[in-house]
Amino acid sequence: MANYRVLVSDPISEKGVEALAAAPGISVDVKTGISFDAKTGKPTEEFLKLIPEYHGLVVRSETKVTAEVFAAAKNLKIIGRAGVGVDNIDRSAATDHGVIVMNTPTGNTISTAEHAFTLMLATARNIGPAHAEVLKGNFKAARKAYQGIELNGKRLAVIGMGRIGTEFAKRAQSFNMHVVAYDPFLSQARADQLKVEL
Protein backbone atom coordinates (compact mmCIF):
# COMPACT_ATOMS: atom_id res chain seq x y z
CA MET A 1 0.00 0.00 0.00
CA ALA A 2 1.23 3.46 -0.89
CA ASN A 3 2.22 5.79 1.93
CA TYR A 4 2.21 8.91 -0.20
CA ARG A 5 -0.09 10.09 -2.95
CA VAL A 6 1.13 12.35 -5.74
CA LEU A 7 -1.09 14.28 -8.12
CA VAL A 8 0.23 15.21 -11.56
CA SER A 9 -2.02 18.10 -12.58
CA ASP A 10 -0.33 19.19 -15.82
CA PRO A 11 0.84 17.08 -18.77
CA ILE A 12 4.35 15.71 -18.28
CA SER A 13 6.35 13.01 -20.02
CA GLU A 14 5.02 9.49 -19.58
CA LYS A 15 8.54 8.50 -18.49
CA GLY A 16 8.29 11.01 -15.66
CA VAL A 17 5.00 9.54 -14.50
CA GLU A 18 6.45 6.02 -14.72
CA ALA A 19 9.49 7.04 -12.66
CA LEU A 20 7.25 8.46 -9.94
CA ALA A 21 4.98 5.41 -9.96
CA ALA A 22 7.99 3.08 -9.69
CA ALA A 23 9.17 4.71 -6.46
CA PRO A 24 8.33 2.59 -3.42
CA GLY A 25 5.47 3.83 -1.27
CA ILE A 26 4.12 6.28 -3.83
CA SER A 27 0.90 6.16 -5.81
CA VAL A 28 0.44 8.57 -8.68
CA ASP A 29 -2.73 10.01 -10.15
CA VAL A 30 -2.65 11.99 -13.40
CA LYS A 31 -5.54 14.43 -13.66
CA THR A 32 -4.76 17.19 -16.11
CA GLY A 33 -6.88 20.15 -17.15
CA ILE A 34 -8.82 20.32 -13.88
CA SER A 35 -6.73 22.66 -11.76
CA PHE A 36 -7.30 26.16 -13.07
CA ASP A 37 -10.19 28.06 -14.59
CA ALA A 38 -8.73 30.51 -17.12
CA LYS A 39 -12.00 32.48 -17.22
CA THR A 40 -12.09 33.22 -13.51
CA GLY A 41 -8.33 33.13 -12.95
CA LYS A 42 -8.87 30.88 -9.95
CA PRO A 43 -8.43 27.22 -9.03
CA THR A 44 -11.42 25.06 -9.90
CA GLU A 45 -13.74 23.75 -7.18
CA GLU A 46 -12.91 20.22 -8.34
CA PHE A 47 -9.19 20.83 -7.77
CA LEU A 48 -9.75 22.40 -4.35
CA LYS A 49 -11.83 19.37 -3.28
CA LEU A 50 -9.24 16.93 -4.66
CA ILE A 51 -5.97 18.45 -3.42
CA PRO A 52 -6.40 17.60 0.32
CA GLU A 53 -5.93 13.90 -0.54
CA TYR A 54 -2.39 14.42 -1.85
CA HIS A 55 1.04 14.68 -0.27
CA GLY A 56 2.81 15.71 -3.47
CA LEU A 57 1.89 17.77 -6.52
CA VAL A 58 3.65 17.89 -9.89
CA VAL A 59 2.90 20.90 -12.10
CA ARG A 60 4.15 22.65 -15.20
CA SER A 61 2.75 26.05 -16.18
CA GLU A 62 -1.01 25.50 -16.34
CA THR A 63 -1.64 24.84 -12.67
CA LYS A 64 -1.57 27.98 -10.53
CA VAL A 65 -0.79 27.01 -6.95
CA THR A 66 -2.27 29.93 -5.05
CA ALA A 67 -2.71 30.66 -1.34
CA GLU A 68 -6.24 29.27 -1.73
CA VAL A 69 -4.81 25.96 -2.98
CA PHE A 70 -2.34 25.78 -0.09
CA ALA A 71 -5.14 26.45 2.41
CA ALA A 72 -7.07 23.48 0.98
CA ALA A 73 -4.04 21.19 0.64
CA LYS A 74 -3.91 19.95 4.22
CA ASN A 75 -1.57 17.01 3.50
CA LEU A 76 0.65 18.63 0.86
CA LYS A 77 4.37 18.32 1.64
CA ILE A 78 6.08 19.00 -1.69
CA ILE A 79 5.49 20.52 -5.12
CA GLY A 80 7.66 19.56 -8.06
CA ARG A 81 7.69 22.04 -10.94
CA ALA A 82 8.58 20.19 -14.14
CA GLY A 83 10.33 23.22 -15.60
CA VAL A 84 12.49 26.17 -14.71
CA GLY A 85 10.29 28.95 -13.36
CA VAL A 86 8.11 28.81 -10.28
CA ASP A 87 6.12 31.98 -10.94
CA ASN A 88 2.88 29.96 -10.99
CA ILE A 89 3.44 28.90 -7.37
CA ASP A 90 2.83 31.24 -4.44
CA ARG A 91 6.13 30.58 -2.67
CA SER A 92 5.24 32.74 0.30
CA ALA A 93 2.12 30.64 0.89
CA ALA A 94 4.20 27.49 0.40
CA THR A 95 6.57 28.65 3.13
CA ASP A 96 3.66 29.53 5.43
CA HIS A 97 2.27 26.00 5.00
CA GLY A 98 5.64 24.22 5.26
CA VAL A 99 5.52 22.95 1.67
CA ILE A 100 8.79 22.43 -0.20
CA VAL A 101 8.85 23.79 -3.77
CA MET A 102 11.31 22.25 -6.22
CA ASN A 103 11.96 22.88 -9.89
CA THR A 104 14.23 21.53 -12.62
CA PRO A 105 16.48 24.49 -13.42
CA THR A 106 18.68 22.63 -15.90
CA GLY A 107 15.88 20.65 -17.51
CA ASN A 108 15.86 22.58 -20.78
CA THR A 109 19.34 24.14 -20.82
CA ILE A 110 20.84 21.97 -23.56
CA SER A 111 17.65 21.92 -25.65
CA THR A 112 17.37 25.71 -25.55
CA ALA A 113 21.05 26.26 -26.40
CA GLU A 114 20.84 23.77 -29.29
CA HIS A 115 17.62 25.33 -30.57
CA ALA A 116 19.09 28.85 -30.49
CA PHE A 117 22.24 27.65 -32.24
CA THR A 118 20.18 25.83 -34.87
CA LEU A 119 18.23 29.01 -35.58
CA MET A 120 21.46 31.00 -35.91
CA LEU A 121 22.92 28.40 -38.27
CA ALA A 122 19.72 28.29 -40.33
CA THR A 123 19.74 32.09 -40.58
CA ALA A 124 23.40 32.26 -41.57
CA ARG A 125 22.87 29.65 -44.30
CA ASN A 126 19.45 30.99 -45.42
CA ILE A 127 17.85 27.59 -44.91
CA GLY A 128 14.24 28.84 -44.69
CA PRO A 129 14.17 31.02 -47.84
CA ALA A 130 16.25 28.53 -49.82
CA HIS A 131 13.94 25.69 -48.85
CA ALA A 132 10.91 27.74 -49.94
CA GLU A 133 12.50 28.37 -53.36
CA VAL A 134 13.36 24.68 -53.78
CA LEU A 135 9.75 23.73 -53.02
CA LYS A 136 8.67 26.11 -55.79
CA GLY A 137 11.12 24.41 -58.16
CA ASN A 138 13.42 27.46 -58.35
CA PHE A 139 16.65 25.50 -57.89
CA LYS A 140 18.88 28.02 -59.64
CA ALA A 141 17.46 30.97 -57.71
CA ALA A 142 17.93 29.11 -54.45
CA ARG A 143 21.51 28.24 -55.29
CA LYS A 144 22.55 31.77 -56.28
CA ALA A 145 20.54 33.97 -53.94
CA TYR A 146 20.78 31.97 -50.74
CA GLN A 147 24.37 30.82 -50.38
CA GLY A 148 24.64 32.24 -46.88
CA ILE A 149 27.75 32.77 -44.80
CA GLU A 150 30.09 30.57 -42.83
CA LEU A 151 30.15 30.86 -39.06
CA ASN A 152 33.82 29.91 -38.94
CA GLY A 153 35.93 32.82 -37.68
CA LYS A 154 32.98 35.14 -37.03
CA ARG A 155 32.52 37.18 -33.83
CA LEU A 156 29.46 36.34 -31.81
CA ALA A 157 28.04 38.39 -28.95
CA VAL A 158 26.28 36.44 -26.22
CA ILE A 159 24.24 38.49 -23.78
CA GLY A 160 24.00 36.62 -20.50
CA MET A 161 26.39 33.80 -19.65
CA GLY A 162 24.13 31.78 -17.41
CA ARG A 163 23.55 28.09 -18.05
CA ILE A 164 22.00 28.57 -21.49
CA GLY A 165 24.38 31.31 -22.63
CA THR A 166 27.36 29.19 -21.60
CA GLU A 167 26.11 26.15 -23.52
CA PHE A 168 25.34 28.34 -26.53
CA ALA A 169 28.88 29.79 -26.41
CA LYS A 170 30.38 26.28 -26.30
CA ARG A 171 28.54 25.36 -29.48
CA ALA A 172 29.71 28.56 -31.17
CA GLN A 173 33.30 27.84 -30.16
CA SER A 174 33.06 24.39 -31.73
CA PHE A 175 32.38 26.25 -35.00
CA ASN A 176 35.56 28.27 -34.40
CA MET A 177 33.63 31.43 -33.58
CA HIS A 178 35.13 34.15 -31.38
CA VAL A 179 32.67 34.68 -28.52
CA VAL A 180 32.29 38.08 -26.86
CA ALA A 181 30.12 37.97 -23.75
CA TYR A 182 28.18 40.59 -21.89
CA ASP A 183 27.17 39.63 -18.39
CA PRO A 184 27.56 42.00 -15.43
CA PHE A 185 27.87 39.01 -13.10
CA LEU A 186 30.59 37.17 -15.04
CA SER A 187 34.04 37.51 -13.50
CA GLN A 188 37.14 37.82 -15.63
CA ALA A 189 38.39 34.52 -14.16
CA ARG A 190 35.18 32.74 -15.24
CA ALA A 191 35.31 34.42 -18.67
CA ASP A 192 38.89 33.16 -19.08
CA GLN A 193 37.79 29.68 -18.05
CA LEU A 194 35.00 29.76 -20.66
CA LYS A 195 37.38 31.25 -23.25
CA VAL A 196 35.14 34.23 -23.92
CA GLU A 197 36.02 37.90 -24.19
CA LEU A 198 34.26 40.32 -21.88
Annotated model-derived regions:
Residues 7, 35, 40, 55-135, ...:
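Phosphate/diphosphate ligand-binding glycine-rich loop within oxidoreductases
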Residues 11-14, 62, 183-188:
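Short, polar loop motifs at secondary-structure junctions
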